[in-house]
Amino acid sequence: MSKKKKVFSEEVELSEIVLEKTNQAFAMIRQEDIVHMGKTNTKGKRIYKMQAAAVAGICILAVSSISVIAAIHHYWGRGMNGNIQASDAQQQELTEQNIAKVYREEPDSSSLAVTDNGITVKPDTVVVDERFAYMSFSISGYHVEDGTEPGFGVVTVYQGDNPEDESSWVNMYGSMYDGIIPDENGSPIYEDGSPLESDENGRIISHYTDSNGDMEYIIQASVVNENDSLLGKTMHVNFQNLGTRSRGAFTPAVEGNWDFAITLPDVSSSRTITVGQKVGGTGFTLETIDISPISMKANYSVEEAPEGHEDDLGIPEVRGVVLKDGTRLPYLTDGGSMGYTDSSRKNACHMAGYDRVIDVDEVAALIVWTSYENEKIEIPISK
C-alpha cells in the first residue's frame, strides 16, 4: 500500500472491464475457475495480496412478502442488497442486532444528506463486523445517458481523525451499483434473476438507476492490519466531482464535494472456530477461522512457505462454504487480503468479505483453493 496518503481514486471500476469480458468469465466459471485482479502490497514485514473477483462480487435477493404483523422492515436498499445478498429475515435480524444500520430510518436522516451543485448524496446502509464495513450512499439529481458509466472523480476513505496516520488506513474498493449480481455459482445475472443483455455494440447493458432515478455508490472497506477492528470506529468518506468513466478514464460533469463521518456499529458478530487441520498438498495448517455472517479470516501456521508464483503468495484461500443442508457456495468470498503475519513466514492469514450473508451455524465445511492452479479441497469444521 502506498505510504503517501489515504486517498483512493475510484480505480476499482470493475463493471466496464468485467462486463466487456463477461463471455470469457462465463466459460471460466463453468470450469469452476475464477478471474481475479491481484495486487501485492508490501508494508514492513507484512505482505498482502489484494484481490477482487472479476465477476463483480455483488448479489441481491428480492424482498419477501410483507409481514402480517405491524413491524418495521429494515430494508437495506437496492445497492446494499446488490453488494451483499441477504434474505428478508437476515436483513431484519442483523439490523435489530445493530450489525447493520439503515440511515433512512433514523429520525435525523434528512440532516445526514449533503447537497452540492444540485446533487444530493446521503448514507443509506452500513453493515459491519470486525474486519469489513460495507457502506452504501444514495445519489439524487444526477443522470447519465444509457450506455455510460457514472462515477466520482475521487473517493477518499479513512478511519479516525488523521488521514496521514498509518493507523487510519483501510483497504477499500468501490463503484456505482450497476444492477448486475452473481448467482450462487458465480455467474452474472441481473438483480431480478434475468440473463444479461447486450446493446448493439456488444456491451452488457447496466442498470445504474432505480425506479426513482437515483443511484447508489457501494464501498467495501477492510482493515489493513489483520489484528485491527472496525467496530465502533468513525469512517470518513469524501466524494469529489461526478462524471462518467470509460476504459478507466474519468470525464467530469459536475463539480462537487460530499463529505461524511460515519460512526460504525460496535456489535461483534464474529466467532473463532478451532480447525487444526492440514491443508492437503501444502505446507499450511488451518489452525482457526474467525467467521461472521459477512466475512472471515483464516489463520494458518506454516511448515514451509512456498515460492510465490507471479502475484500469488501461495497461501491457501477460503473461497466458499458448504452448508449443512448440502448447499454449496463455491464463490462466496469477494475481495480481501492475504499475507504472512511475521518475518519468519511461519504464520499467515487470509481475510475476505462475502457476496451474501450466511448463517454461521449452518456452515459444515470450507471450500479452500490450495494453489494458483485453483486446486480445491473441502475442510469440515465443527462449532
Regions flagged by a language model, labelled:
Residues S15, K49-Q51, D359:
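Alpha-helix initiation/capping motif
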Residues M1-R46:
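Disordered, charged N-terminal biogenesis/targeting segments of membrane/secreted proteins
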Residues E10, T22, R30, I66-K383:
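Alpha-helical, hydrophobic structural elements that either
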Residues K39, A54, D312-G314:
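Intrinsic structural disorder/low-complexity segments
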Residues N41-I72:
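Internal signal-anchor transmembrane helix that establishes type II topology
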